[in-house]
Amino acid sequence: MMKQIQVDLGERSYPIYIGQNLMNDSEALSRYLFKKRILIVTNETVAPLYLNQIQEVMVSFGEVESVILPDGEQFKDLTHLDAIFTALLQRNYGRDSVLVALGGGVIGDMTGFAAACYQRGIDFIQIPTTLLSQVDSSVGGKTAVNHPLGKNMIGAFYQPQLVLIDTQCLHTLPAREFAAGMAEVIKYGIMWDGEFFQWLENNVQALKRLETEALVYAISRCCEIKADVVSQDETEQGVRALLNLGHTFGHAIEAEMGYGNWLHGEAVAAGTVLAAQTARSLGLIDESIVCRIVQLLQAFDLPVSAPESMDFDSFIQHMRRDKKVLGGQIRLVLPTGIGQADVFSQVTESTLEQVICCA
C-alpha cells in the first residue's frame, strides 16, 4: 500500500510517495522520467545495494547514467559538488535532463544544489535511502554543501519534482544510521505534535524491529508535518524555523568534532537535550518534560549530552555563525511543551554558558 502526501507550493507542488518496494514501481516514476536523460547521483555505499535495481526500472524511460561519490558528511563540499557538474558537462546533459538523488541526506542535498545551479535549474527527484533523509532532508527544498567554517552555508531553496520513499531501504541501513534518523523523528513530536511524541514512546520496539506499519506511519506523520510547515513558509521566514529544534547546538557539535565523526542525527539528539535544558533554565518547561525527551532519545541509543571535549567557547564560536543569527543575536528554537516550540532571540550567553557547562 502506497501513501501519498502533497507539498502544496502552487505551480511547484509535488508529491511524496511512501511505501514498500516503491523503487520497483515504474508507474510511480514514469510521469517524471519519460523520454528524459537521467543522471543518478549516489554513493559508494548505496550503489552496490540499489543502483542496478533502479537503473533497470528507469532504462525504460530514457538514457540512464550514474555518478558515484564517496560516502560521508566530510565529502559534502564544493569539490565533490563539482564532480556532479563535471559528469553533466562531459556527457552533454541539457536543461531537459533529470538528476536523481539516490542516497541519504548528503547525496540529496548535493544533488538538489547541483540541480538548482546547472544551467540555472534542471529537474531532480529525491529517492532517500536513510531514515533521516526520508523524514527530513528530502522534503522541503533545502539544498546545500558545507564549508569548513560552517554546515550548509552554501546552498539554495530548490524543490524536487517528486520524493519517493521506499521503506524497504531501511532494512539495509546500519543500526547507528537508523538511530540517527530517529532523532529527527522525535524532533517532530517535540516541536509540533504531542500525540505523535506519545505514540513514539509507545512504539519504540515496533520501530526498532522495522515493522512496516509502524515505519510507514512514523515517516508519513513526519512528512505531513514537514509538508504543512513548508507550504506555509518555504524559505524559513517564520514557522519553518521551528524545524531547527536542536540544530543550533547540533551544528556546533558537528563542526567542532569534524563532519562525519558525529552523525547529523546524533548531534541533533544531543542538541535537542541542550535546547530542552535551556528551556528548563528559562522556566519554559519543567524537569519532567526534559526527562521524557531524554528517555525517548536514549531508547533509540542516541547521545543525550555533548562531547566532553567541547566547552562553552567551542559552542559559542560556531553558534554565532548559525544561519538563524539576526542582528548579531543567536536565535534558538526551544520547546515550550511536548508538541510545541518557539524561537527565542533573547537568550543570554551567560544562560547558555550555565546550561552547557552543567550539562
Curated annotation (Swiss-Prot):
<dbReference type="GO" id="GO:0005737">
    <property type="term" value="C:cytoplasm"/>
</dbReference>
<keyword id="KW-0456">Lyase</keyword>
<keyword id="KW-0547">Nucleotide-binding</keyword>
<comment type="similarity">
    <text>Belongs to the sugar phosphate cyclases superfamily. Dehydroquinate synthase family.</text>
</comment>
<dbReference type="Pfam" id="PF01761">
    <property type="entry name" value="DHQ_synthase"/>
</dbReference>
<dbReference type="InterPro" id="IPR016037">
    <property type="entry name" value="DHQ_synth_AroB"/>
</dbReference>
<comment type="function">
    <text>Catalyzes the conversion of 3-deoxy-D-arabino-heptulosonate 7-phosphate (DAHP) to dehydroquinate (DHQ).</text>
</comment>
<dbReference type="InterPro" id="IPR050071">
    <property type="entry name" value="Dehydroquinate_synthase"/>
</dbReference>
<keyword id="KW-0520">NAD</keyword>
<feature type="binding site">
    <location>
        <begin position="169"/>
        <end position="172"/>
    </location>
    <ligand>
        <name>NAD(+)</name>
    </ligand>
</feature>
<dbReference type="Pfam" id="PF24621">
    <property type="entry name" value="DHQS_C"/>
</dbReference>
<feature type="binding site">
    <location>
        <position position="247"/>
    </location>
    <ligand>
        <name>Zn(2+)</name>
    </ligand>
</feature>
<comment type="pathway">
    <text>Metabolic intermediate biosynthesis; chorismate biosynthesis; chorismate from D-erythrose 4-phosphate and phosphoenolpyruvate: step 2/7.</text>
</comment>
<keyword id="KW-0963">Cytoplasm</keyword>
<feature type="binding site">
    <location>
        <position position="142"/>
    </location>
    <ligand>
        <name>NAD(+)</name>
    </ligand>
</feature>
<keyword id="KW-0479">Metal-binding</keyword>
<keyword id="KW-0862">Zinc</keyword>
<feature type="binding site">
    <location>
        <begin position="71"/>
        <end position="76"/>
    </location>
    <ligand>
        <name>NAD(+)</name>
    </ligand>
</feature>
<dbReference type="GO" id="GO:0009073">
    <property type="term" value="P:aromatic amino acid family biosynthetic process"/>
</dbReference>
<feature type="binding site">
    <location>
        <begin position="105"/>
        <end position="109"/>
    </location>
    <ligand>
        <name>NAD(+)</name>
    </ligand>
</feature>
<dbReference type="GO" id="GO:0009423">
    <property type="term" value="P:chorismate biosynthetic process"/>
</dbReference>
<dbReference type="GO" id="GO:0008652">
    <property type="term" value="P:amino acid biosynthetic process"/>
</dbReference>
<dbReference type="GO" id="GO:0046872">
    <property type="term" value="F:metal ion binding"/>
</dbReference>
<keyword id="KW-0028">Amino-acid biosynthesis</keyword>
<keyword id="KW-0057">Aromatic amino acid biosynthesis</keyword>
<dbReference type="InterPro" id="IPR030960">
    <property type="entry name" value="DHQS/DOIS_N"/>
</dbReference>
<keyword id="KW-0170">Cobalt</keyword>
<dbReference type="GO" id="GO:0000166">
    <property type="term" value="F:nucleotide binding"/>
</dbReference>
<feature type="binding site">
    <location>
        <position position="264"/>
    </location>
    <ligand>
        <name>Zn(2+)</name>
    </ligand>
</feature>
<dbReference type="InterPro" id="IPR056179">
    <property type="entry name" value="DHQS_C"/>
</dbReference>
<dbReference type="GO" id="GO:0003856">
    <property type="term" value="F:3-dehydroquinate synthase activity"/>
</dbReference>
<feature type="binding site">
    <location>
        <position position="184"/>
    </location>
    <ligand>
        <name>Zn(2+)</name>
    </ligand>
</feature>
<protein>
    <recommendedName>
        <fullName>3-dehydroquinate synthase</fullName>
        <ecNumber>4.2.3.4</ecNumber>
    </recommendedName>
</protein>
<feature type="binding site">
    <location>
        <begin position="129"/>
        <end position="130"/>
    </location>
    <ligand>
        <name>NAD(+)</name>
    </ligand>
</feature>
<dbReference type="InterPro" id="IPR030963">
    <property type="entry name" value="DHQ_synth_fam"/>
</dbReference>
<feature type="binding site">
    <location>
        <position position="151"/>
    </location>
    <ligand>
        <name>NAD(+)</name>
    </ligand>
</feature>
